[in-house]
Amino acid sequence: SIAMINELAKVLDTTSTYLIGYEHDEKNIRSLSDIMDFLFKLDRVTGLNFRIDVKRPPHYDEWECSITFNGKDKSADFNADMCLFLEEFAEYREQYRNGGMRSQRYKELQDKDLAYYSATEVEEKPLD
């Protein structure tokens, strides 16, 4: 189980993702286009639906854009997982930003989440 892997990682002073063989590249974002490319790829994931909301002047005072996942969308198998992840991420991200969490703990929580979801495979929708 993932809980056992997390405990083993603590005992062995390593990460859960290392133990399960999951590798992630921390230097792959080099430009804003890399982030935009990720959004294009995200849009092609089967089982994941999201809405993009845009609020801008003159109809709104601020210019805001957001990506929304509906966790109750039955046609999107991974939306509930995204909502659970984002809910937890928002909490520990806020704690970290406000100085209530050390960077080591922040990295441990990231590693735990990546290890947990690493076995959940997704497929891309074919381009027409």
Question: Where are the regions a protein language model picked out?
Answer:
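Long, hydrophobic alpha-helical segments
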Residues: 2-5
